[in-house]
């Protein structure tokens, strides 16, 4: 039985916790993310090492949805540049997802260790990402969280391939998507502007990745006071909406025109005019000889160390400020005027957020060239203009990530991404105005992801992690269905039923 997974339906057959420990040795936790703990696991039969992601069902609906989503998507895909699913076990209390183990380094670390780094090296990285994304897009899958942190080398060999990880935000594109999701510095204009979007958001993110790899700088940044996070983020989103970036000197002086052309086409503001992943693979900078061999390591590394190795900002402060601004668009200016005092009581800071959101869409950003967005700061996208949005509220997390909600709200995560929340703080009216929610809607009903992450970090882990032995024993898992697409659809349907409940 290659996969210890459940058959979806009214009657569920769960794996027994002992099935996991009978087959795998789970070491100590090597990383804690928003939704799961990550272990290095050893197959007792083959001795092969894998990565294990353990999701606790008791941690909430968003955690269960993320696990089901990742399982469903990974069962659909098989590509050399995507970490492959090895095994799945679902007990009554946990999800265990076993993946290939990537032992190489992140792309940033690889660049810093090189003696020679040129456009050709960047072209090789971008080509592999484009090939993986073109494959995903052929299946109508949108990754939605492409960023440098999710690109790693498969091993430490000289010619190691690049692999893409982290699929808990990936989504089947059944019609255009509307929930905001991703990592702020990589968000496409249509996501920041709360428009419906699809596969082109991944191509925009690849353009941002390419820009950083060629210059060491993020394309959108502002020079602000060290603690002025609100202005930084307000201007960041305004610049993204306008596509306001430059190939500034001296960082781009030695970069070929072909490279600049591909970046420009990937970062086209209008999503219907943006180059596709398949088209980008055929671009001369990827498939031809247009990429330069000139060594650009010194300039790129200097900027990487300046922009991304510095202190990673005070995330909690930055996210809290941004969340206040994000809550404000949910109420129209008319509704806010009619119930200002009630709004101030129920959602502190919302009024200040409204002012920031209005400024975000109405004023131009000052130019700057020193301050850069931190490598792993993750915050929620701002509204495109002063026009209020009608989707849900946002709750800040302590590490600066954001997650899309089923109703369009954004809740910060802990791994630099954006995932769906479940409650609403404003109800849209038929005339486009938003009606403030009652007081109880502002009270969280479940423990926040930030609190759970803090608990996980503070609680010492045993030498060997075991599945919950108190979980009720059930029948053994069923073999996977013959159709991966049907199984993935099953996970998606179950997730939707859970949200509806």
Swiss-Prot record:
Compositional bias (Polar residues): 387-428, 438-451
InterPro entries: Kinase-like_dom_sf, Prot_kinase_dom
Residues where Phosphothreonine is found: 435, 459
Membrane topology reported for the UniProt record: Peripheral membrane protein
Cofactor list: Ca(2+)
GO terms under cellular component: cytoplasm; cytoplasmic vesicle membrane; glutamatergic synapse; plasma membrane; synapse
Main localization, broad class: membrane
One term of GO molecular function: calcium/calmodulin-dependent protein kinase activity
Biased composition, class Low complexity, residue ranges: 331-365
Highest taxon, organism lineage: Eukaryota
GO biological process, one term: modulation of chemical synaptic transmission
Region of interest: Disordered: 327-501
Span of domain Protein kinase: 24-286
Pfam families recorded: Pkinase
Compartments where located: Cell membrane; Cytoplasmic vesicle membrane
Subunit structure: Interacts with calmodulin, in the presence of calcium.
Protein task: Does not appear to have detectable kinase activity.
UniProt comment concerning the protein's domains: The protein kinase domain is predicted to be catalytically inactive.
Family: Belongs to the protein kinase superfamily. CAMK Ser/Thr protein kinase family.
Name recorded for this polypeptide: CaM kinase-like vesicle-associated protein
Organism field: Homo sapiens (Human)
Classification of source organism: Eukaryota, Metazoa, Chordata, Craniata, Vertebrata
